[in-house]
Amino acid sequence: MIEQVLHYWYYVLPAFIIFHWIVSAIHTNSLRRKLGAKPFTHTQLDGFYGFKFGRDFLKAKRIGRQVDLINSRFPDDIDTFSSYTFGNHVIFTRDPENIKALLATQFNDFSLGGRIKFFKPLLGYGIFTLDGEGWKHSRAMLRPQFAREQLPMSPSLEPHFNVKAYPQEQRWVFDIQELFFRFTVDSATEFLFGESVNSLKSASIGCDEETELEERKKFAEAFNKAQEYISTRVALQQLYWFVNNSEFKECNEIVHKFTNYYVQKALDATPEELEKQSGYVFLYELVKQTRDPNVLRDHHSISLLAGRDTTAGLLSFAVFELARNPHIWAKLREDVESQFGLGEESRIEEITFESLKRCEYLKAVMNETLRLHPSVPRNARFALKDTTLPRGGGPDGKDPILVRKMSCSIFISGTQIDPKHYGKDAKLFRPERWFESSTRNLGWAYLPFNGGPRICLGQQFALTEAGYILVRLAQSFDTLELKPDTEYLTKISHLTMCLFGAFVKMD
């Protein structure tokens, strides 16, 4: 009996698969004709349904080379291709026209897909994880908190720029990214919660020791570790549920406990106390809009991620590039000297949002850093319906392609080093390019802070904070040097940060 059943399925199952493939192909061709699309110009097969590429990506992720791996899949003449990753059909693109469609002109055709499932254990429900009305409500709630009048200024930032924290002996080589992490978490927690965690006041970096809550000591490590797990969940796509071990859960609990401490403190404050609060406090303003502790916690976890990691990454790579290009560092110091003075003649009180905008070379340095090391090197969208993207089909890749409820991987990092947009020296750190006519109309070929309706609310906050620190470093130090034999900084995958730190000498 069993042999008869097996014999039956031996013929039926292959026949069903072939029949399904034929029907699917006919339907796909019909949709292409209906929507005016063409077959993909380029298709890359990476083992059985992309499991080989998925394995290679996870291996590259461990050594900080995942951005390089994806870049290697884009020869100069290919901007869009079809492939598979862990069984999921994915469109990879760095074409500005496709990116514009995904993020703006066809915004309603696409969603974040599985992001909520990947991110929820750490970040909950918020502006980074929600679609539709939930996202609109979250964005409307957060938008006023990043108004120009709330941007960080000298009085709020200077206490966190503790020059004593920067080893100043030539023989000292230290990880400046660690200091930038501490600076950004200090300034972010003061902005968000009304009080800084004062992580720069740590005996381990030569400053005054201070007693801290146990949660404060554990928070940064737990936050970093949880993000590593999140990035692996994203890489695994539909297999994300494999990554849910006890360490991941413990890290999430530590982060939530840290945030809940401040949320409860704000909820316990009376309306009169909230009104009398001196200075602007992000959390206290949100408490006026909602009393839901989970909503408050999720918004603050997401804001802390954005406020800490992206700015620290921008500063770390800016210093890395300046340290290996002494002539650019010298030119930046000249720009800073003309605007704010150097050394003992520094005019710190004059560093404002408006005055930083006048430092043209400083802006060029930050633009170039974000071009080569964008804070979010890759992004993704999922098609909500059968639709098209403008390019990637036909004999030359210029015709529309059909997108059938599938994932689209947006590779901003690849776009921003493409010679078609930035010339033959696209991979070279050269701030002067931002004074040339070729960079005046880049459009969707330069997206350091995303684009379309989801453009980053905190971009001016990040640029002001990073600009302030670069000015203060230029005022305080004559030279920057890299750790010997440092030619490349490995990167983590979820945001552009240095996997093993950024080691420099300063004098």
UniProtKB/Swiss-Prot annotation:
What is one cellular component GO term in this UniProt entry? membrane
Q: What S-S linkages are listed for this chain?
A: none
| Keyword tags | Heme, Iron, Membrane, Metal-binding, Monooxygenase, Oxidoreductase, Transmembrane, Transmembrane helix
**Principal location listed in the UniProt entry:** membrane
Keyword check for Acyltransferase = no
Picking any one GO molecular function of the record gives:
iron ion binding
- The transmembrane segments are 6-26
Q: What is its EC number?
A: 1.14.14.-
Cofactor(s) needed: heme
Q: Which InterPro entries match?
A: Cyt_P450, Cyt_P450_CS, Cyt_P450_E_CYP52_ascomycetes, Cyt_P450_E_CYP52_fungi, Cyt_P450_E_grp-II, Cyt_P450_sf
**Induction and repression of expression:** By various alkanes.
The membrane-topology field of this record reads: Single-pass membrane protein
Where found in the cell?
Membrane
Q: Which Gene3D superfamilies match?
A: Cytochrome P450
The entry marks the following residues as binding heme, namely: 456
Family, per entry: Belongs to the cytochrome P450 family.
The free-text function statement in the UniProt record for this protein reads:
Together with an NADPH cytochrome P450 the enzyme system catalyzes the terminal hydroxylation as the first step in the assimilation of alkanes and fatty acids. Preferentially hydroxylates lauric acid.
- PANTHER family from the xrefs? P450, PUTATIVE (EUROFUNG)-RELATED
Q: What's the protein name?
A: Cytochrome P450 52A7
Organism annotation: Candida tropicalis
